UniProtKB/Swiss-Prot annotation:
Biological source species: Human adenovirus A serotype 12
Protein name according to UniProt: Pre-hexon-linking protein IIIa
Protein role: Structural component of the virion that acts as a cement protein on the capsid exterior which mediates the interactions between the hexons, including the peripentonal hexons, and reaches all the way to the penton vertices. Two hexon linking proteins IIIa, one from each facet, stabilize the unique edge interface between a pair of facets. As the virus enters the host cell, hexon linking proteins IIIa are shed concomitant with virion acidification in the endosome.
HAMAP family: ADV_CAP3
Localization per Swiss-Prot or TrEMBL: Virion; Host nucleus
Site (Cleavage): 565-566
Alphabetical keyword list: Capsid decoration protein, Capsid protein, Host nucleus, Late protein, Phosphoprotein, Viral genome packaging, Viral release from host cell, Virion
Amino acid sequence: MQRPAIIAERAPNLDPAVLAAMQSQPSGVTASDDWTAAMDRIMALTARSPDAFRQQPQANRFSAILEAVVPSRTNPTHEKVLTIVNALLDSKAIRKDEAGLIYNALLERVARYNSTNVQANLDRMGTDVKEALAQRERFHRDGNLGSLVALNAFLSTQPANVPRGQEDYTNFISALRLMVTEVPQSEVYQSGPDYFFQTSRQGLQTVNLTQAFKNLQGLWGVRAPVGDRSTLSSLLTPNSRLLLLLIAPFTNTNSLSRDSYLGHLVTLYREAIGQAQVDEQTYQEITSVSRALGQEDTGSLEATLNFLLTNRRQQVPPQYTLNAEEERILRYVQQSVSLYLMREGATPSAALDMTARNMEPSFYASNRAFINRLMDYLHRAAAMNGEYFTNAILNPHWLPPPGFYTGEFDLPEGNDGFLWDDVTDSLFSPAVIGHHGKKEAGDEGPLLDSRASSPFPSLTSLPASVNSGRTTRPRLTGESEYLNDPILFPVRDKNFPNNGIESLVDKMSRWKTYAQERREWEERQPRPVRPPRQRWQRRKKGAHAGDEGSDDSADDSSVLDLGGSGNPFAHLRPQGCIGSLY
C-alpha cells in the first residue's frame, strides 16, 4: 500500500512519468523474455520432475498455456494513476502518508465509472434488449400473419354476395379484418370444421365465426320497425351478439346503414362502450385535496368531477349524413309542405300536420323515428324563425345541420321586428359621439348628414329645444308629407306575441312637442299671395328716378322694358351738378 511513497523517497528528482514506469514493472513473463526460457519455466512448475506439468489440473495447465501463447493485454490505467499521485506528491498537494490512500481511491473510482468491463456490459445489455424486441416483433408479426391466413381461409368459405345489404356485408368483413390485424393478444384458428376468433386482451373471449356468420346470413339489410325490433332480436344468438360487440369499436356511422337492424344494434354497442372512463387515480387525488381544504360534501364533488372528467373532453366532431332512404323522405316532405303553403295558403304548422296525416301507415311505421325527428325539427324552425323554415322547405338541396342528428337543435334567431334590432354598434362609436358633441357652427353640415343616415325614424324630427341656437332653413311646401310617406319606409314585421310593446312603441313615436306642433300648424296655414306689380308703376318709378338723379342706374326691369317713354340711358349720365359753360 505504501509502495508509491517509498519509491518516491528513493528517487525524488525523477520525472513522475518515469517514476511511474519504474514502479509498474511486472515481475512475471514479458514479451521481451526468451520464448524457450518462458516454456522452461512453464514446464518446470515443480522442482522434482518436468513431467509433473502433466499431472497439474486441466484448468491450471490450460491457463498457463494460454497466457504463454497469447499474453494478456497491458492496461496502462494504473500507470496513469500512479503518475498523477507522484505529481501530487511533487506539488505537495498531498502528504507522503496519504499517497497510498489516494492511489487506491482513484483506482476504485476508475474501475467503477470508467471501466471497459462496465462499458462492455452496457453494450451487451443493449444488444440483448434489441434482440429481445426483434424476437417479440417477429413473433407478433408471425402470429398476426397466421391469423390473417386463417381468416382468409374462413372468408373463402363464405359467399361473396348476399341477397340484401351487400354494402353492409362488405363493410362488416372489412371491420373484421381490421379487428384481427390491430387487436393484440388475439388470433384466428381452425378447430374441426369451424373457425374461431379468440382474444385475451380483457379476459378470455372466444367467438365461433362459422356459427356467427351462419346466424347473420339472413339478417343483412333487414329493416325492422321500432316496435318490431324485439321480435327480430330473438333471432340473434349470444355468439353473434358477442361478435357484434367486439366489432363495434372498429366501425363508424357510415359503415353500416343506421336504418337496418344490425346497423342500429352496432351503433348502440359502439355508443355504449365508447363512453369515456373516469381516471380513478385522478379522482382520488382531487377528492383528497378537496377534503384537505375543508369541503366534505362528496356528493356535489362527485357530480362536479364526473362532469369535468367525462363531458369536457375534446373530441373530433363526428360526420353525420343521411342515407338514400332518409334523403328521399326529406325531399318528399319538402315538396308536400311547399305545395300546401303555395297553393292552399296554409300555415307552416298546418302544412306539416297535413303532410304527416297523408303519409301511408306502413311507410310511416318503417321510418317512424326519422319522420318524428324531422317533423319536430321543422315545427321548431317554423315557430322560432319563419324565414329559416321557408328557406329549408324551398331549397331542393337543403340538408339538416349536425344538431338534427344529436337532438341539440340550434336554430338561428329570427327578426322580432323591434326598433332596437336596427341599431348597430357603429352608431355609438367614440368617433360618432365626439362628432355629435362639437359646438362649432361649421359642424352643422356633418350633423345634418348624420341625422339623415341615422337608423332611428324619430331622429329626423328632433325637438326644437335641441336645435336651439342654430339656424335652420325654411321647409318647402309638401316636404314633410314626402319625408313621412309610408311607402319610403321598409315594412316592419309585427311581433304578434308582443303586440302590447308594439302598440306602446307606436304611441310613443306619435308624441310631439309643442314646438313641433306649432311648426306644423304654421306650415298648414295659407300664405298671402303678393299681387303682381303693374307696368305703369314701374315706368313711373323709372321716370321719377331719371328726373331727380338720385339713382345711379335705372331699374333692371325698366332697362329690359324697351316699350314706352323715358330715358333708357339715364344710367350713363354724369354724377354731380354741372354749371353753364358760358
